[in-house]
Amino acid sequence: WKAERMGLSNDPYTPAQARIEAEGVIAREQSNGELLLSARRNRLIVEERLHVPMPGKHRFRKKTSWTFGIDNQDRDGFFIGRNLQPIEVARDFTLSLQPQFMVQRAINGQNTTISELFGLKAELKGQIWGWDTTWEADITTFKPQDLADGSRYWGNLENDFELPWLGDITARLFGAHRYRAWNGSLGETDIYAALGGFIEQRKTFDLGKSSNSYLWRLGLGNYQAERFSSVSLVDSMRANFYGSINSSYSIWRGKEAPMTPQKAYRYSPVAIVPGLTFDTNVNTLLAAYGDGTHQNTLSFSGGPTLTLGTFSQPFLDYTRVSMSGGVTLKQGSSPFNFDQAVDLSTLGIGITQQIVGPLLLNAGFDINVDAGSEFYGDVINSNIELSWQRRSYDFGIYFNPYEGIGGIRFRLHDFDFNGTGVPFMPYTPTNWMEMANTDRPF
């Protein structure tokens, strides 16, 4: 369709906190569902004060075009990335590219060559033989001598099936080269090669006042990864079963602010409801290895989450505090570093606090509290973020000291007005092994 003048906003209220104003507009919907706008004049207006000129062509996607990040391990600190327009390489495949420039490497490096200052993130998504497939590459240098050690690759093929008695399950075939993993007190560890597959099922259900979800996963693969307590590598088969149940029980639920743009939706696209819940996780991991060894764990973690205020007043009207303690029982030992259970007693604390207006501070950490462990007192995860949260957009600066990664993000919320998006995600402590085993691609 065409229009001489157009206004577009993701804010259902007037005045809109963020809107796009364009002249001489031609709009085309792409095959992947994205909307491509071409205009003679295009600008983003924020809070009716800030006018930001925009390109004549704009593609509405969930991620912003520019990325500002910190990666102390692979990129030597601060870097800038640019998300290019996706390329349709075939009828069923789309290639997304993000060239990167290593700013801090350029500033600090005395003998750095041009090829070391650039990197690339690439993602190829598509469908083959009815399977959804995603392949990703993370290249942090183009220096020929360092290209092999400066690149990481991983991908999978995924499909849904229905099995008798089990219902719908997901099957996934995976592969990885130099995959970057984290394992609590052991820190970063590389999986140099992985090839295998698994089936899994995820479900949610309510039981009385509790909301529950479960995951089970059965997998088999061959891994070449760093050996536990050694600098050498180990190559071995690994068969494993993982099961997890999360529950949240509502103890007290308050009343949200009136559903108006001056109250409940003053700063947030969702109404904040005061309350107290008790959250628990029970999980087990059974793993057998090609050398005849095995490792079995049974973990329990739980704790309260208290929400005070409705985030509708200009000062200290939203506080969210979470606390979680975890205990793990362990039998046997893994030959690998990436799945070795070492943090057998943990404590996590997270807090989100409104400072003034839409300014929020979000911080949290998990530590090892096993008095008999050599890692007693070690931080096994941490996060801190300062965000400017509005009904239709948010801006955040975040850093994870444990992983040494961080960044700056600006995001317009989804046009269906149904969530806060990233990075406004209050930190909730969780059992480390439960988190690590569900987030990995294998």
What are these model-predicted stretches?
Residues S211-R217, G221, E226-F228, V234-F442:
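Exposed, low-structure sequence patches enriched in small/polar residues
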Residues R152-N156, A176-F198, R202, R217-N246, ...:
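C-terminal, extended alpha-helical scaffolding domains
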Residues I169-A171, L195:
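N-terminal lobe of the biotin/lipoate ligase/transferase fold
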Residues S31-L35, K209, P314:
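Short, solvent-exposed loop/turn segments that connect beta-strands within catalytic domains
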Residues W1-G167, H177-T189, A341-S345, V356-S373, ...:
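Structural signature for solvent-exposed beta-strand/loop edge elements and short helix-capping sites
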Residues S115-L117, T140-F142, G150-R152, G187, ...:
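Acidic, Ser/Thr- and Pro/Gly-rich intrinsically disordered regions
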Residues E21, L195, S382:
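Residues that flank catalytic or metal-binding motifs in active/ligand-binding sites
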Residues W129, L163-L166, L207, V270, ...:
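Short, aromatic- and cysteine-enriched interfacial helices/patches
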